[in-house]
A protein has these predicted regions:
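Alpha-helical transmembrane segments of multi-pass small-molecule/ion transporters
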Residues: 1-384
Length: 384
């Protein structure tokens, strides 16, 4: 067994360990505590070490724009995924519009990037993610209110307070603060050697805990509900296939040939969906607390289930692709994988929801029979 395959096997064992711990620690406080540690301590420490350990190139400043462009492209292609998956419920469609184009690489990708691609790739990923954060925090916030106003026929836009809260969240989030601090530190011509060794050792020790804690958290996040599973799994395959297809096409068109960058963008394109759109939907849901459930703008329960399945799906998918890293460096192979994901998503949609396709087929046959009867009657009238 190769060293990469061996390490990935260990990762899967940690996920399994987390899943088994789920039955021991079934209180939400345990899971929430792990999440707080990851997002507020382990990830910021790891990102800081990765950024100050590399030389930041001025071209890195374009990375957030690349992420923003990718988010917007997936957002406008989301109706295609919804059409393929036969989602007809308006509340679910709005919920998926919010989620499908969002990405959360911090939990699903950063530990893997840190382990397999190194400091420089993690530094790039952190800067790229800032563009994604602009999209999920600001753009999707306005989308949520647009859906709310349209659904409730509401023209009053008293959004100043929540907008201020969102902007504060953007700049006060620990990961973003660390990115700004690290970039300011490097822009002052300082290096990692200018940081006290005690602080470096502390951050390094915290960094070493990131991967196992995240993988255990992913194991804890795995849920099994047959009906929910059948509705969400096809969409996760469709989303991954579309994101992989677009990122690969963009890299080929722009002439990317750096192996580490190719692997980095492939991994990032397979990130799980972000929690931030769910917070926007929850905020809107609170505004609609006096409205009947079926008339609300979003289906927050469905959104929460989608989040719960997205994180383990993304991480397991990425880990499954890494044993043969050379596979990811051939664009034809990646195209094949992305198209396979799309076909699997379509196949699962048909298998899990056959009645939708049968009803469509029935409607189609009814239409054909109507046309046939119309022309038959017309012909008989003419002959008479």
């Amino acid at each position: 067994m190769s060293s990469v395959a061996s390490e990935i096997t260990v990762f899967f064992i940690l996920i399994l360990l987390g899943f088994l711990l789920k039955f021991k620690f079934n209180k939400p406080d345990f899971k929430n505590g792990l999440k707080l540690y990851i997002l507020n301590i382990a990830l910021p420490a790891t990102i800081f070490i990765s950024i100050v350990s590399v030389q930041i190139n001025s071209k890195y400043l374009l990375f957030p724009l690349i992420a923003l462009f990718f988010n917007i492209m997936i957002f406008f292609l989301s109706p295609v995924l919804l059409k393929i998956s036969n989602i007809t419920d308006a509340r679910k469609k709005r919920t998926l519009f919010m989620l499908l184009a969002s990405f959360a690489p911090g939990l699903s990708c950063f530990p893997i990037i840190n382990e397999f691609l190194g400091y420089e790739s993690l530094a790039k990923a952190s800067i790229i993610d800032f563009g994604n954060k602009l999209f999920v925090l600001i753009f999707l916030f306005f989308v949520a209110f647009k859906f709310h106003n349209s659904n409730q026929n509401n023209t009053n836009n008293n959004n100043n307070k929540p907008i201020n809260t969102i902007i504060k969240s953007l700049f006060l989030e620990p990961i973003n603060i660390i990115i700004f601090m690290a970039i300011l530190f490097l822009s002052s011509r300082s290096t990692i050697n200018d940081i006290p060794i005690l602080l470096i050792d502390l951050f390094s020790k915290i960094k070493d805990t990131l991967t196992p804690v995240v993988l255990i958290f992913i194991g804890l996040s795995i849920v099994f509900n047959r009906n929910v599973f059948k509705n969400i799994l096809p969409l996760l395959f469709l989303r991954s296939g579309l994101c992989l297809l677009i990122s690969t096409a963009c890299m080929q068109i722009t002439g990317f040939n750096l192996s580490e960058d190719i692997k980095l963008f492939i991994v990032l394109s397979l990130s799980s969906v972000s929690f931030w759109p769910f917070l926007h939907m929850t905020f809107v849901d609170n505004l609609e607390k006096n409205i009947e459930e079926e008339k609300k703008t979003f289906d927050t329960r469905y959104g929460l289930n989608f989040l719960a399945y997205s994180l383990p799906f993304s991480t397991i998918t990425i880990l499954s692709l890494f044993p043969n890293e050379q596979l990811l460096l051939n664009f034809n192979n990646v195209y094949f994988i992305s198209i396979s994901f799309l076909l699997i998503g379509i196949f699962l949609t048909i298998i899990f929801n056959p009645y939708r396709f049968k009803s469509k087929e029935k409607k189609s046959m009814d239409g054909i029979n109507y046309i046939r009867e119309f022309f038959t009657n017309k012909l008989e009238t003419t002959q008479k």
